[in-house]
Amino acid sequence: MEGEEESEQRKNLPKDDGTLALGIDFGSCRISSAVWNKNKKGTQLVKDQNKNDIYFDAFLSFEKEIDYGMNRLNDGVDISSKYIDDEKKEEEKNEKEKKEEDYGIDRLNEGVEVSNKQKDEGKKEEVYDDKPHIIKELKEFPSNPENVVYNIKQILGQKYNSDYLKKIKQNLIFKIEEEKKEDEKSENKKNTNRPVFKLKNKTIPFEKLASYLFKKCIDDAEKNLKNKVGNVVVSIPHSFNKIQRQAIKDAVRIAGIENVHIINDTTAALIYYAFKYHIHKTEYFLICDMGQNKLDCAVVRINKQNCIKVLSSGGDNRFGGEKFNQPLIKLLYENFINDGGNDFLKKNPKETFKFLTSVEMAKRNLTFMKETEINLQKIDGENDIIHSLTREDFDKLNEKNYAYVLECIDQVIKESKIDRSQLNNVILLGESLRIPKLVELIGEKFEDCNFITELYNIISQGAAIYAAHWGNKLNSDKFKNFKVYDITQLSLGIRTEGDLISTILPRGSRIPIKVTKSFLTTQDHQKKVKFEVYQGERKFSKDNDLLCRIILKGITENSRGTVELDVTFEVNEDNILTVKANEKNKNEEVQISAFANGNMDEEEVKKLIEIAERARKEDEEKEERVKASLRLYELILKFTTMFGENEELWSIIEEYRNWLMHAGIVPKQEYEKKRIELMRKMPRDEEFYEEEKKEEEKKVVEAVA
């Protein structure tokens, strides 16, 4: 995907030599970014808009935040409407340029304001500019909150008809529609199942909105360091699916950078920690990062050579700080309606905005205060919401949410297969993991661990270090032997005969990784083979998630079971799965790429794992039955080829073929019994039995459906 036309600022910078490596923490609540400059071996000096030096080793972190009175919106984008006549166009343009010049590298949230213009005031026709600008600050609540776009990260890459998007749309003030594209086969437009932001008479894809945010990070870095960004690493939750990851990479490309890499949030944080604090021995870390809409947990091992290995990862891509607001929102609103208040939610966007952000602010206040007050005058035009809230009240409302966080932590430790006593450090990131009661509960579980909670913006800084390492620009002795090993979230395999899954990469496999496995054809004179790639923990394809299909054509036509095919699974650092298939000893191959995390969110992943655990015994029994029936079927086919011309033997073979066709579900032992019976009724052929023995020994070769 091509990026936007290069800005004048970039054209005037020195030719890109990969000097600047940019790390971006694409959070739900804000975007923060950090830079590594290879020309500065140590402290990097950068001036902010107040002419103050920022010191932080060899990289800088400048965050983006917006203060909406009492709130910092999630990735807020303000699409404001202005009527402009022909006589005022030049004046408006100059004013806009002046405002943009003043933005500097303030601590801004991901807010973007898109201005609309009117060519003819008499017609009152709104025409919206495609190029938004970042809002610096709003002193009061916005006058048009329905044009403030937030939660871009959560919507990016979602399907329009997904249950998740349907659910979150209920709490959004701005409008989302399904994208429609021209259909070449008809005059009508066809639905794409892709959500877009609705702005009056036009729509804007969320990839485009996200690109404005990434472009601001890139422009700020280049403006202040007077050089071009070479590599960009964006950190995201580990559970982001293939569509979300690709959408983020596309957004960065739209912003003008082609060299983009993806890394998990928790991994990025540990990279920074390993760089900042010298580790003298192997240590185990539990790291938890809770944003506005996600919870990431991981158990990681770091040795003294700065080799970072993720042992397990988990959490919930739909659980975050907003969940702690919901019980309070429900309590306040129900009390307000019961006391005679008017229903204002969704009916009055501005007052709804005030109400929701006041609840968010109250939650934050209770982090450092024991009591706070929500005071909203005439919220419905007539009645007030005035409510005093203590920490104890808030904790009681969120007991179930606290328990759920602890469950996620317990699960990720269990999957790491280490003893809890081996943990040395616990790192808590994100504002929601500063809630006093939640910190207390986690502390009680890990009393002997070193707690680290005051590390701000370390995810973006870790991403910047990784960007430098990725571009071979990390001129640091500390990270001379630096390596990162992440893991696959679910098992990956292909469907084989009998609907069985042949696992090629088990869940928790270290990435990057490349594995090849051999298979055989299942039909005589087969011309092509279809491979179906699945992820999941169940034994049968119908119980797992289909990732992709590839077809290998032009294979050698021969008897079934004689043509050997190689299937290769390769997962890179971005969790991108590439599948290749070729006939053994032939150069021709086919391949396809898919993200190893597929289309599932963390909740679906956890559900699949739980189902797989409960069904494991049943699946294993069914698998054994299917394999036994296939062995009998193979024997019938071989005897048909060997003795098909002998009428007496043919009738015996046909008898067992009919039994197999009508047997239904029988125990594995019954298939084995029939197989032995059939072998005893056939003439003994030494060559055949020698071949059977070799087949038993060659267990690595399986049949492809």
Residue ranges and their predicted role:
Residues M1-Q170, K175-N193, K198-Y212, D219-A705:
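Oxyanion-binding/catalytic loops of NTP- or PPi-dependent enzymes
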